Amino acid sequence: MNKNIIQIYLFVFILLLKQHIVILKNEEFTNPYSIRKKDIKAIVNVNNKLKSINIHKLDNINKKDLLGSYNENYILIKLKKQDIFSKKLSTYYGEVQIGEQSENNMNVLFDTGSSQVWILNDTCKNSLCNNIHSKYKRTKSFVYKYDKKGLPSVIEIFYLSGKIVAFEGYDTIYLGKKLKIPHTNISFATKVDIPILEEFKWDGIIGLGFQNGDSIKRGIKPFLDILKDDKILTNKNYKNQFGYYLSDKEGYITLGGIDNRLKNTPDEEIIWTPVSTEMGYWTIQIMGIRKEYVNNHFEENKEEEEVIVKYEAFHDGGKNSIIDTGTYLIYAPKNTMENYLKDLKINNCDEKYNLPHLIFQIKSDEIKTIKGSAIIEIVLTPNDYVIEYVDKKNNTKECILGIQPDEQSEEDNVDGWTLGQVFLKAYYTIFDKDNLKIGFVRSKRNVTLR
């Protein structure tokens, strides 16, 4: 073996020995249209690293995470970013092909806040199905879905921002231009009454959520269940998981595995939290949140240090929180925003440096060697949660908070936090379907993959 290769492996092995998982011991303590749910606001610049909090060390390092061979262990789906400056709005979408011969190229929103798959049909003629959109043309591989009376199934899908009317059927979907998902249940929209869609460039939604009451009633299988039950990923030696990465200009989904180049540092450990699927969302338990004031002017140049964190935290009373790739902002429980975070305000970009770090205390993946509840801590800096954008009218830089109170918690059945794309730009997030858990690791800024 080449001497240089031996040295590289030795260096990687040393890094593995030095790694540790960060956790904190705590003894005290649906209808989906995501961009819909909340007002989406513009463009975020993300930087700063995850603060290392060392309370306990574990030795079971997953070497595959470190030594995995990038594009060989996942399917890459590139996400394009669309900014609508007049509305301080941004969205990310990716391309899929539909039809056995890939006849239809469509742009879709990949939405963990939904279990529905729908696209615009070529019979949709109202103004919201305008010329910026691609529309599905029926293929030879299309099959109708029939209702109990033997008639083609027609449905209405209601969202907080409106509704769509669609007929149901089946066709083949290709992801990353090479992963084939045959006989996928799709709703083909013939009428759209969601005004905000008119300016978006995506043509439909691929829901990456779980089964809910609606999907059970309609007898449809969520997209992720198709991938798992039909062994579409595992038959090709991929995992039933996907990573979600966003940058200032674009993003990526790594379907079937992870890419360490998207981490802040390649050997940085992923920290995991268990997931509940009862509501159809990727639901996690946020146990509390606290503020930490630091000198943000110098934070980027500081060496990271291990910090012992106090056990106590503000408990916001809303544990069930969701990770939603289809929502742009972060939404806090209204009571939390009006009380504990009431001083979280910004009038100009200079005031960003006076804002605190926000530290989320999240239930950890079960670790049997620790007594009590294991808690992981996720840090958001002002650079993470303050949105910067350019006012085109005055050509000035403006700043707004990327965290807003959740005024719609009753409608979407979420009593805790909704962590949208503002959060996801700070953390490369791994959604593990097999083990029902989510992993977080600080993102490296503005990575470009080929």
Curated annotation (Swiss-Prot):
Keyword Cytoplasm in annotation: yes
SUPFAM superfamilies tied to this protein: Acid proteases
Keyword Signal: yes
GO cellular component, one term: cytoplasm
Application in biotechnology: High doses of antibodies against PMVII partially reduce infectivity in A.stephensi mosquito.
Principal cellular location given in the protein's record: cytoplasm
Domain Peptidase A1 residue range list: 92-441
Range of residues in the leader sequence: 1-24
Subcellular location: Cytoplasm
Any one GO MF annotation of this record: aspartic-type endopeptidase activity
A GO biological-process term: proteolysis
Pfam families: Asp
UniProt xrefs under Gene3D superfamilies: Acid Proteases (2.40.70.10)
Keywords: Aspartyl protease, Cytoplasm, Hydrolase, Protease, Signal, Zymogen
Enzyme nomenclature, EC number: 3.4.23.-
Active site residues of this protein: D111, D324
CDD domains registered for this protein in UniProt: pepsin_like
Recorded family membership: Belongs to the peptidase A1 family.
Protein name per the record: Plasmepsin VII
Organism: Plasmodium falciparum (isolate NF54)
Gene (name only): PMVII
